[in-house]
From Swiss-Prot:
Allosterically activated by GTP. The gene is upp. Disulfide bonds: none annotated. Keywords: Allosteric enzyme, Glycosyltransferase, GTP-binding, Magnesium, Nucleotide-binding, Transferase. This is Uracil phosphoribosyltransferase. InterPro entries: PRibTrfase_dom (IPR000836), PRTase-like (IPR029057), Upp_B (IPR034332), UPRTase/APRTase (IPR050054), Ura_phspho_trans (IPR005765). GO terms for biological process: UMP salvage; uracil salvage. Pathway: Pyrimidine metabolism; UMP biosynthesis via salvage pathway; UMP from uracil: step 1/1. It comes from the Bacteria. The keyword Mitochondrion does not apply. Uracil binds at I200, G205, D206, A207. It comes from Burkholderia ambifaria (strain ATCC BAA-244 / DSM 16087 / CCUG 44356 / LMG 19182 / AMMD) (Burkholderia cepacia (strain AMMD)). NCBIfam families: PRK00129.1, upp. Belongs to the UPRTase family. Its EC number is 2.4.2.9.
Length: 216
């Protein structure tokens, strides 16, 4: 795990396995099936770091030999909220790690001015729940900011929100940080820049199209 001094709320998961798999995702010749599998695997690996600081309490259990007070996650279970549509490919990896998590959805599409347009919000009960928002790309940052806005407007505290993405552009991270400096953003790579079409460079193309085998 490393950080960039420009972005205090950004955490880059630089584990060799994650970087290896991300390289294969970037390859334009990687098949839809392999892209989907790699996205799931990387998200699972990132999930280990994202959940490192979950609150812990103890529970009395009987082992075959003795009774013991053993650690369990405190409070309500996690909620995983993919930003549609590409975020769906990340939710499976997180559910592999935490299969009892609740799942919500936030649907947005990017308008011609690159601003997000919301078309769907479905969330589990919010009280005392820890939320992980997921979307493979933080390009302009507007969709990520909007997703966090959705939760904060419903009085979810910033400390209970984490955003996870595969790749991000510095421009988008800056937008996210300006809007939500109190929310942690985890990525596998901070890429170079956005091009004139607001695509991340080098990036991995359109994550949704590559995930579902569609064309923009």
């Amino acid at each position: 795990m490393k950080q960039d001094s420009r972005f205090p709320n950004l955490f880059i998961t630089d584990h060799p396995l994650i970087q290896h798999k991300l390289t294969h995702m970037r390859d334009k010749d990687t098949s839809t099936r392999t892209f989907r599998e790699l996205l799931r695997e990387i998200t699972l690996l990132m999930g280990y770091e994202i959940t490192r600081n979950l609150p812990i309490t103890t529970k009395r259990v009987e082992t075959p030999l003795v009774a013991v007070d053993a650690p369990v996650i405190a409070g309500k279970k996690l909620a995983i909220v993919p930003v549609l549509r590409a975020g769906i490919g990340m939710s499976d990896g997180l559910l592999d790690l935490v299969p009892s998590a609740r799942v919500g959805h936030i649907g947005v599409y990017r308008a011609e001015d690159h601003r997000p347009v919301e078309y769907l919000v479905r969330l589990p009960d919010l009280e005392d729940r820890i939320f992980i928002l997921c979307d493979p790309m933080v390009a302009t940052g507007y969709s990520a900011v909007h997703a966090v806005d959705v939760l904060k407007r419903r009085n979810v505290p910033a400390a209970n929100i984490t955003f996870v993405a595969l790749v991000a552009a510095p421009e988008g991270v800056q937008v996210f940080q300006d809007a939500h400096p109190d929310v942690k953003l985890f990525v596998a790579s901070l890429d170079s820049h956005l091009n004139e079409h607001a695509y991340i460079v080098p990036g991995l193309g359109d994550a949704g199209d590559r995930l579902f085998g569609t064309k923009n």
